[in-house]
Amino acid sequence: MTDQADTSERKPKAAGKTLSLKRTVESGHVRQNFSHGRSKSVVVEKKKKRTLKTSADAAPAAAPAAAPAAAEEVAKKPVAAPEVKPAAPVEERPAPVAKAAPEVKAVPAPAPAAAPAVEKKPSRSRSGVVLRTLTEEEKNARAQALDSAREREGEDRRRAEEEARRFAEEDARREAERAAAAARAAEEASRHTADQSTRTRAAEEAKRRLDDDRPAATPAAARPAKEQAIEEDDDKPKRGAGHTPAKAPPARRSEERRRGKLTITKAFDDESERQRSLASMRRRVERERKKHMGIQEAPQKIIREVVIPEVITIQELANRMAERAVDVMKILMKQGIMLKITDVIDSDTAQLVAEELGHTVKRVAESDVEEGLVGEADIEEAKQARAPVVTVMGHVDHGKTSLLDALRKTDVAAGEAGGITQHIGAYQVNLSSGERITFLDTPGHAAFTSMRARGAKVTDIVVLVVAADDGVMPQTIEAINHAKAAGVPMIVAINKMDKPEADPTRVKNELLQHEVVVEDFGGDVLTVPISAKTGMGLDKLEETILLQAELLDIRANPDRAAEGIIVEAKLDRGRGPVGTVLVQRGTLKVGDIIVAGAEWGRVRALINDRGENVESAGPSVPVEVLGLGGAPEAGDVISVVESEGRAREVTAYRQRLQRDKRVGTGGRTSLDQMLSQLKEQDKKELPIVVKADVQGSAEAIVQALEKLGTDEVTARVLHVGVGGVTESDVTLATASRAPIIGFNVRANTQARDAARQAGVEIRYYSVIYDLVDDIKAAMSGMLSPELRETFLGNAEILEIFNISKTGKVAGCRVTEGVVRRGSHVRLIRDDVVIHEGKLSTLKRFKDEVKEVQSGQECGMAFEGYQDMRKGDVIECFDVEVVQRSLA
């Protein structure tokens, strides 16, 4: 291969060409010749480094003349300084120029050499004339300028020294940190080396022990000649291999497990490989030793915690235990239960099977899905003051509706917004003082009692409206009973005070007859005279409500998941299911997933009582909620859940309960069943609703029932009225789980249908003595029964026998009295009662007998107890339950 360079670029250029910089790249063409007649032309460029030369390097002889010229070019004004008498101002003026161009300071500029250059220019001579003609003021000004320049130079010098000192400190600190890091790295390296040596020694020791445990090698003479020849061939070095050592096996490419603290040295150390721990080596040696010795370890059984619901199939139980379904069926067969793999067993049987297989059991019920639905009680520090919730109750003709309308007119926010646009059953009134009051409209008191029946306390204060000209009416008394049953404070608003026949004193006296003691008579019930027609006393009523709320200290936590109650619900044609919600605590927001009774949904919109869309609603704020799957019932508690799956689970359980209740408990609840429920709940009060034909009979019945009460049980009359049994009476009885007693009265059709649907029992009487006897019997059933023991006999244990199916059986001799099967027994050891239970087996000569007389021998076994010893005494007795009754 030959190279041919083109040097045409190196020829001298024409003289008439424009001047330019000298090129630093020389290019040429080279042709490369290859075999088989192939060639290739290549462009070759040669780059030269351009060096910049100063005038001093180019012409050394002209250096003395160039230096004064440079000094004159950079600092022309300082050169004229010798010609001026005031030397100080002229010397100080070029100070900034000298600072900006430090090169001038390095080049000497003597005055004799610079003076002739300045004298050649006439402008310098004129400048000297100007300086000689300066006035005193100008001289002083220049002197001050020079002084300030000197001060600035001093400050700059001090600042530079401070910067230099700080930089020196930083350098020293960084040097110290580097030294400390180096020391730590050295320490880590030494520790790593020590750990490596320890692991190496442990591995060598383990290998030595493993070699010692292996069986001795077979002698060469005993092995076949072929195997020996093969080994000899293996021992000979391969051709061309020489004495090259054997190639090490490839290292494991897995990452090293980090031990201890990660340091910079460890992070950048790629040579270190993951090493086996000492415990791992020991486990490996132990496994190999057992393998050589032929020891086989049985697989260890895994004990699991099995969650068992109320009912479960055999297949599901086996899956949860990770066992075979056949094994589960075998255990059931041993117990005499023949079932298929798809059959359902109860939780008790499933627990026995799981415990038989060695697993632990966790019993759960369907009602567990509601656990955690209602949040825990809030701490006092998180609670904030909220608006009171007020329910207005009273007779329909006493101005309750007029009072509600008048209170709406006092709402300043409603006046600004143009009035309330719709009525949703609950609304807020914004007072001029900035306070807020939430009013709950409960026509007919139906929603009020249904809320109380579900255990929800929504109302904080009850405002009882009584007409001053009409006094206390039957529905007023019913409203009083509702307020007492709810256990909330009451404020009496005496309405229609603008009429001339108004008599507030009469109203107060009539209230006193129904155990409502007003403040004027020494009680704690506040009274406010008002007039809904003229607006008189409304401000006083609002102040009284706020005062009562302040005494109650009504507070709630707004910073949590919302909880509230459904005031009313309806199915709107355009918007779907709509529920009016009164938030009790927390904040309800758009997008929350809520559960209300047996319905759930995601909040699509919140509408306040003025028809405005809002993003959230805090405590005591009533809003309409859109987005529920169906219309809930009034009084249902609303809760916010974390997911749709949880909401579906809760609502499915509640819907199943409602369906089972409709199917299974369609009949009426009897008085005996209701009393048994009351006993189970440890209630010592018997609630009753009494309706009579005349007021005298009603008062006589109430007095007779009050005399039946004792220290343990008493009759609580919720409501006494004159006239037939109405639907409102049934509603009150449903909420309180009370029977209705009718004396010479009957229930109308609506009340009978409501009682049949709600399961309320209505009893009719015409003789007061029969009524009192039945109530006395019902109250006697609420008393706890008396237990009386009757001694039967004693037996001494002579011997203990172990029976495969039964367990331990005690061979006894009856020493006193008689022993009966199924009676209660006590096991006495050293005159101390060890166990108390029942006899499960009583045998005589392998035959089951009912009783064994004194002096005879028999076999006994206890229910669920096996710790019996020779010499123990068995005491047999009967327990008699004696029902107590009122005297």
UniProtKB/Swiss-Prot annotation:
Record localization: Cytoplasm
Region (G5) residue spans: 531-533
Biased composition annotated in UniProt, kind: Basic and acidic residues: 148-178, 185-194, 201-215, 267-276
Positions of the UniProt region annotated as G2: 419-423
Main subcellular location of this protein, as a coarse class: cytoplasm
Annotated segments matching region G1: 394-401
Keywords: Cytoplasm, GTP-binding, Initiation factor, Nucleotide-binding, Protein biosynthesis
GO molecular function, one term: guanosine tetraphosphate binding
Stretches assigned to the tr-type G domain: 385-553
Region annotation Disordered: where it falls in the sequence: 1-291
Annotated region (G3), positions in chain: 441-444
CDD domains listed in its UniProt record: IF2_eIF5B, IF2_mtIF2_II, mtIF2_IVc
Low complexity bias: start-end ranges: 58-117
One GO CC term on file: cytosol
Entry binding sites for GTP: 394-401, 441-445, 495-498
Gene3D superfamilies named among the record's database cross-references: P-loop containing nucleotide triphosphate hydrolases, Translation factors, Translation initiation factor IF- 2, domain 3
Coiled-coil positions: none
Pfam family name, one: GTP_EFTU_D2
PROSITE patterns xrefs: G_TR_2, IF2
Annotated spans, G4: 495-498
Record function comment: One of the essential components for the initiation of protein synthesis. Protects formylmethionyl-tRNA from spontaneous hydrolysis and promotes its binding to the 30S ribosomal subunits. Also involved in the hydrolysis of GTP during the formation of the 70S ribosomal complex.
Protein family membership: Belongs to the TRAFAC class translation factor GTPase superfamily. Classic translation factor GTPase family. IF-2 subfamily.
Name of this protein: Translation initiation factor IF-2
Origin species: Parvibaculum lavamentivorans (strain DS-1 / DSM 13023 / NCIMB 13966)
Gene giving rise to this polypeptide: infB
